[in-house]
Amino acid sequence: MNKMKKNVIASVAKQSFAALSIASLVFMTACGDDSSSGPSSTGDEPELSSSSNDDEGSSSSKKKGKSSSSVGEASSSSVEESSSSSEISVSLTGVVFGSDYSTGELRWIDKDGKISESSLSFHQDSKVVTNGADLYVLERKGADNITKIDPEKLESKGKKAVVWQVSLDDEANPVDMAFDGDQAWVALQNADSLVKISTEDGKVKKSIKIGKFAYEGEHSPYVADIELDDGSLYVLMQRYTQDENYVVTYPKGLLAIYDASTGDLKDTIQLKSKNPSNVAVIGGNVYVATHGEYNAAYGTDADSQRGIEKVNVSKKKSELLISGEDLGGGIASMVVDGEVVYVSINLGYDENYAAIQALKKVDISAKKVDDVEGFTDMSGSMAIDDGLLYVGDRSVPAVVTWNGKKKNTIKQPKGALPPYNIALF
């Protein structure tokens, strides 16, 4: 791999979750993010109002007329329908977001496991999140929007299923949401703050500054994931930095714990390893999955510098419970099903920059790791419900389910883009 390609990969790899495939990294760095594909309020769609946060903790810095903790005007772009919809509303199993790294689309999965023929267009780098009833599309760096959608109206109403859409500061890069009743915390990976918004209208209710946790010279600690449990908000920070030659430095990750109601900082805990990817609360205990540093092949080594950490909040300590030696490398993504977690292990990338990954099933309490055969690229994300695992396998490309014994490939509609993100209701 030549020096320019190495620089391109290193430049963007640190800006997103470790699970992103190198193909997307090359495209976004070389071409720039397309910010014109997000939804907006036009015609007879819901009208969106600008709003600001009057909370004392809100940011006072300004960028293009918006504070870094504010939700601004509706995006100037629009949702596009790829085909007409029927007039029958349906209950859904979940949604799948597809991307070819230049365009992105949202499709939905009905109770029979069929993916919709119709789709809505969004920014090519987006994440779908649900709270069990509503759907949210986080359009990431380059579009920087949050869109709430009524899933029951998707099939019958198409783009009119949009309830509201709000625009964030440029390059705020929303990456996750954690729901707290009729409000939700939003992680902004490239900003110096977290915001709490109303799920009714998207208006900011609270903002907390996190820039003090950034690595020296950086403005953001680069939040990778957030989790809300029993009144506490767990904020996972990667805290990397990059020099002018695109060389990335990863210090050990940091877990910050906030009061989910007030936004007050309760504690911080230094992790044992670097480049964390996911945080989860399992059986009252906090666990963190870490990817660690990349090796020369842009994969990860099977060593003790990465794995699954168990965090002892009361003692402010973290221990490496299951190492990369047991897993075969670093964790790109993790989903939880009771005491069992499924993790995708980053092994590297092929000559076409497609991810090469291994899928592992981990029994947390027994510290037992098992291989799940037949999956080679989970960079289209994973989701799980009642023991049924959904994998966005971009090597197929399709959404593939696994019930612990048998795989089933969900048929892709003609022209559907490869899976990039999955969320279940």
Model-derived features: positions:
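Bacterial Sec-dependent N-terminal signal peptides
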Residues: M4-N7, L20, S24-G94, T262
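Conserved beta-strand positions in repeat-built beta-propeller and related beta-rich domains
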Residues: V90-S102, V137-G142, V186-N190, V235-E244, ...
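A short beta-strand motif characteristic of beta-propeller blades
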Residues: D112-L120, E155-L168, K203-E216, D264-Q270, ...
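Repeated scaffold domains used in trafficking and secretory/extracellular systems
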Residues: F122-D134, E171-G181, E216-E227, L271-G283, ...
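Asp-box/WD-like beta-propeller blade repeats and closely related beta-sheet repeat scaffolds
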Residues: V163-W164, L168-G181, A187-V195, T199-E227
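Beta-propeller blade signature
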Residues: V248-A260, A302-V313, I356-D363
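Loop/turn-rich, solvent-exposed surfaces of beta-rich toroidal or solenoidal domains
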Residues: D326-V362, V369-D393
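Blade-level signature of beta-propeller repeat domains, shared across WD40, Kelch, NHL, RCC1
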Residues: G392-V400, G404-F425
